[in-house]
Amino acid sequence: MNDSTLALRRERRLLMLLGWVCIALLAGALYLQYVKNEDPCPLCIIQRYFFAAIGIFAFLAAGIRNWRVIWVFELLIAIAAAGGVGTAARHLSIQMNPGFSCGFDTLQPIVDSLPPAQWFPGMFKVAGLCETVYPPIFGILLPGWALIGFAVILVAVASSLWRHRRKLAG
């Protein structure tokens, strides 16, 4: 086995791990929604979409044996993570500044009209307001945890893209 094969195997394992982490995060969101009665707002649902997209791209990439295709999927993961960072940062700023709103009247119909909201309403239907602050977990608000998660994913995947850029030529 050469170094490229070992690196590919390692990368695919890390992508599988990322996919499972995203599933765990979405399961945690459902736990908070249904057990703790913390209704998701439009920005929460958008963050769920980003975590779902990252997980789907990670699982698809893990099944590929071609560096170029993996690189494309990792680029898509990085784009979704960047979108998640922006959404979570906006959500966190709304919760830190109580006079603001996410624009529930504007965002809610758009988010609720997306096809996944029709297919999986328990997961992707809006039921709350962005300015509702739920109890922090270990001193950090939920959008703060999402921001940390998206930022870690973005940095990890961006470093992987940078580290493996030479494999694209080969």
Swiss-Prot record:
Cellular location(s): Cell inner membrane
Chain ranges on the Periplasmic side, renumbered to this chain: 32-49, 90-144
Ranges annotated as spanning the membrane: 15-31, 50-64, 72-89, 145-163
Pfam families recorded: DsbB
Record membrane topology: Multi-pass membrane protein
Residue pairs linked by disulfide bridges in the UniProt entry: 41-44, 102-130
Gene Ontology CC entries for this record: plasma membrane
Any one Gene Ontology molecular-function term assigned to this protein's record: electron transfer activity
Family listed: Belongs to the DsbB family.
Name of the protein in question: Disulfide bond formation protein B
Gene name linked to the record: dsbB
